[in-house]
């Protein structure tokens, strides 16, 4: 007798006639007049539960089996048999069922066997993984993460663990969480009355990182091809379906690479990870297509077979102006494209994923390479039908004098970036990279619109429960 996951039984990897044990939680219990109970046992290894057929001849049938409710944890031992009923190919004919844990009060159990609103599930985030929806999201999230690591490994990239605590503002926007051990009720002060951060833990101001990019560049300029994959933080007071204060980012950096090189990398990576989900999580994707977004599977299949379009920002503005479409946000050269503009380009005009390149320098970060026209930088956004921007990237500015000028132009102190500037002083090379918001990616794949529902414990303004 061996302990096996539910998925092995349902997919036929446990031989018919073999004796196995499965462990999990009760989804439902149905009793027949013939003295047989059908207990659906779920262990999270796949979307569907396994049906255990329990006969009333078991010694604990009356006292325990007939009292099982949704959420009880059980260990079921039995024989794998072909299922005569619809809905599953295999089931277990139980020879023993051990109740590991009871639900204290089934009437008040927060995850009772009914459909719950997505808003309610956020209030019980510690229990919501037990639902079909969040369980499926968790498995897809895992598959996407593994596919990302696998893609980069197969293509010769090294994973770099960049720091979560930093003294640098990658985006130059100032929306950072401060890290401090100072006593807020007794702050040390300088002669001018400012907070004296030299007395703080790090001897200077420190923050939670908004991006691993700058640190990633240091390793790209030694190992050639690297990527970071970890949490990032933005103290942006935005209560929208697209924003989180804590989220995960995938950020490759490539030495000797142009903007076009990383645009090609982005296309290759997205198609790889989407195909992995289609291949490995068909059961979960079927659920999303049936219950969340009927286009979920077809959207990914179209994506992996599409050729990416490419367009300069200036030409994209002309396309929008000539569209005859009435947008909520006015269109003019110099604006940052809004979601409605991005989706028009991807869904209506190109009808395919599109890479928009060469944005105005005034709406982009200091580290992006200045183009010869002096007005634009070598930046790109990958726009996907159905969501808009899914990746943002650029060729990095490798010329020290130009980088210094950009820092000054944006009011940033170049001394704070002394180590970043050193990369331009000692064997500088053209290099490029991009950032992919992992939760935005999961939202696109699953059709779950709010990013708060695709991360285990969302962190948003005035919300840090659990």
From Swiss-Prot:
Protein name: Asparagine--tRNA ligase
Similarity-based family: Belongs to the class-II aminoacyl-tRNA synthetase family.
Keyword Nucleus: no
Localization terms from the record: Cytoplasm
Enzyme Commission number(s) of this protein: 6.1.1.22
Pfam families linked: tRNA-synt_2, tRNA_anti-codon
Subunit structure: Homodimer.
Keywords, comma-separated and alphabetical: Aminoacyl-tRNA synthetase, ATP-binding, Cytoplasm, Ligase, Nucleotide-binding, Protein biosynthesis
Source organism, top-level taxon: Bacteria
Native source species: Yersinia pestis
